[in-house]
Amino acid sequence: MKKIVLAFDSFKGSVGSFEIAKAAEKAIQEELPDCQIIRFPIADGGEGTTEALCSALHAQTVSCRVHDPFMKPIEVSYGIVNNGAMAIIEMASACGLPLIDSNRRNPMKTTTYGVGEMVADALKRGCREFIIGIGGSATNDAGIGMLKALGTRFLDSGNGELEPVGENLIKVHQIDISQLNPALKESKFTIACDVSNPFFGEEGAAYVYAPQKGATMLQVIELDNGLRHYAQVIKEYTNMDISQLPGAGAAGGMGGGLLPFLNAELQSGIEVILKTLRFEEVVRQADLILTGEGKLDRQTGMGKALDGILRVGEKCQVPVIALGGAVEATEALNRMGFTAVLPIQPFPVTLEEAMQPEFTKENIERTVRQVVRIIKQFTK
């Protein structure tokens, strides 16, 4: 085996894609010292998006102070490219799940306000083009936090201004954009989303993703009702129906919530990443693609990173093996086209133990070593 491409997404809440790829590379080097290894850390719009794009485009990294999902001060960074014209912003850096301890997660109370502050900072620096990766969030506020930070006001039936959090979507009665940052009129946004889910419903933002953000079943229902209500308010104010738009449910509804108010378009995050980084050119002469993410399940085939990698692998006739911290629906994943799908856990552990960064890296290294040892026996 002469060439292996490592194209891992982040193991959300545990280890980023760069560190995962380094652990896999170490295992391959020990077993196949003459093999060419190409580390290609990727992202689908969530964690690692800024890192992957900024690395490929040699971006300038800038920092700013914003607010986290619970409105606590935090320092974040983002990339600027194209001679200062474009900002590459990762939503997860301001309101991602890893910023909140698992026992404190509550999408009823979290906000995307900090993302809006990042955009405002970039506007001040002269940026007018934006790529915003919107996966991996701890929020379900449909982007009203971000819009509030940019000047939008959300009012209840008594004209009181609402706090921009998930539980208040159901209370939105009026939307006031009269104070929206004027620089937005000359700005363009590419919203890189990691899923194709609609805004609400059984496959929407609340039902599919809110539980992993800490929501109880009752809260899921309340959030979904809020999204339904807010979609209707948006339609009344802008004449845009975002209810069943593919990707509108990404990042707690942020995918759809931004389109009516910004010069924005939704694109598959993985397509943005792979095209920018010219992934297909790298894969053409490879013998194997190793990929993976924290959890492999039915969502893996819904426009997420591994689905995009698999499509390129199939096009170039290169086998794709996927590793996951947890694996569900193995047969369905095999039918999607993966050569093999493997869990990395060596024995039963608690979720908290499984998410420990060092434990995850050790498991990746051990699993990749076993995969390579098997391959060696059949390629002698």
Go through each PLM region and give its residues.
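N-terminal loops that bind phosphate or other acidic moieties
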Residues: 2-134, 138-380
